[in-house]
C-alpha cells in the first residue's frame, strides 16, 4: 500500500474489529452512512487494490439505508452469520477453520497484550486478530519499539489470519443474503492481502 499511512491502516483494522465484534447500534448505523464515512471511503479508494471492495461496501450501505428496520435486520444477519452453528454461517473464529486457536494467544503475549474481560468471546475471534493488527500498526507509527520486531509480529499475525480468512469471507458471501457483512469481509480480505504483500 502506498497512499495510506500506518495510522490510517491501524484505524481501518480497529473499525473492522468493532464491526465484526458486535451488532451495530443505531449510532454506528447512522455513522456508516454519514458524509464523514463517505470521505473516509474516498480515502480508502485512493489505494487502488481497495477500490472495488470499498465500492461494494458503499453499495451495500446505500441499500441498507432504505431497508425497513435496518438495525434489526442487520442484527439478525449478524446473529445468523456469526453466532449460530457453522452449517450455514461464517463463524469468526480461527478454530472453526481447523486453525490453531492458541496461535493468537502466543501472538498477543509476544505483543505484550491480552484480551479484555469486556469481550466475552474466545481469543481466536476475528476481532482479536484485527485489534492486534491495529495495535501493531499504531506501534509502527510511534517508533518506540524497533520496527523490525513489530513488523515481524505483524507478518506472523497476517500469516495466521490468511490461513482462514479466505474461507471466512467466502462463507460470508455465501450466507449473507443482504450483503453488508459479505462486503465488509471482502474489504478485510483485500486489506489483509495488501498488508501482507507490503512486507
Curated annotation (Swiss-Prot):
Task: Indicate where this protein resides in the cell.
Answer: Cytoplasm
Q: Which cysteines are joined by disulfide bonds?
A: none
Under the heading InterPro entries, the entry gives: Chaperone_TorD, DMSO/NO3_reduct_chaperone, HscB_C_sf, TorD-like_sf, TorD/DmsD_chaperones
Instruction: List the source organism.
Output: Escherichia coli O45:K1 (strain S88 / ExPEC)
* Stated role: Involved in the biogenesis of TorA. Acts on TorA before the insertion of the molybdenum cofactor and, as a result, probably favors a conformation of the apoenzyme that is competent for acquiring the cofactor.
Q: Name one GO biological process term.
A: protein complex oligomerization
The gene it comes from is: torD
What this protein is called in its record is Chaperone protein TorD
Task: Report the Pfam families cross-referenced here.
Answer: Nitrate_red_del (PF02613)
Family, according to the entry, reads as follows: Belongs to the TorD/DmsD family. TorD subfamily.
The entry's cellular-component GO terms read:
cytoplasm
Query: Main location per UniProt?
Result: cytoplasm
Q: Which Gene3D superfamilies match?
A: 1.20.120.1820, HscB, C-terminal domain
Keyword annotations from UniProtKB, A to Z: Chaperone, Cytoplasm
Amino acid at each position: 500500500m502506498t497512499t495510506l499511512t500506518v495510522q490510517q491502516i491501524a484505524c481501518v483494522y480497529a473499525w473492522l474489529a468493532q464491526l465484526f465484534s458486535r451488532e451495530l447500534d443505531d449510532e454506528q448505523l447512522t455513522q456508516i452512512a454519514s458524509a464523514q464515512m463517505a470521505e473516509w471511503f474516498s480515502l480508502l479508494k485512493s489505494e487502488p487494490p481497495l477500490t472495488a471492495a470499498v465500492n461494494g461496501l458503499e453499495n451495500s450501505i446505500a441499500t441498507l439505508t432504505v431497508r425497513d428496520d435496518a438495525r434489526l435486520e442487520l442484527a439478525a444477519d449478524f446473529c445468523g452469520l456469526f453466532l449460530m452453528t457453522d452449517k450455514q454461517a461464517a463463524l469468526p473464529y480461527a478454530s472453526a477453520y481447523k486453525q490453531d486457536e492458541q496461535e493468537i494467544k502466543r501472538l498477543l503475549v509476544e505483543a505484550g497484550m491480552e484480551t479484555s474481560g469486556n469481550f466475552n468471546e474466545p481469543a481466536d475471534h476475528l476481532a482479536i486478530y484485527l485489534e492486534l493488527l491495529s495495535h501493531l500498526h499504531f506501534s509502527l507509527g510511534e517508533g518506540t519499539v524497533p520496527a523490525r520486531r513489530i513488523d515481524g509480529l505483524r507478518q506472523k499475525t497476517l500469516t495466521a489470519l490468511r490461513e482462514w480468512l479466505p474461507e471466512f469471507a467466502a462463507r460470508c458471501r455465501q450466507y449473507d443474503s443482504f450483503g453488508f457483512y459479505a462486503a465488509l469481509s471482502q474489504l478485510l480480505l483485500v486489506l489483509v492481502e495488501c498488508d501482507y504483500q507490503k512486507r
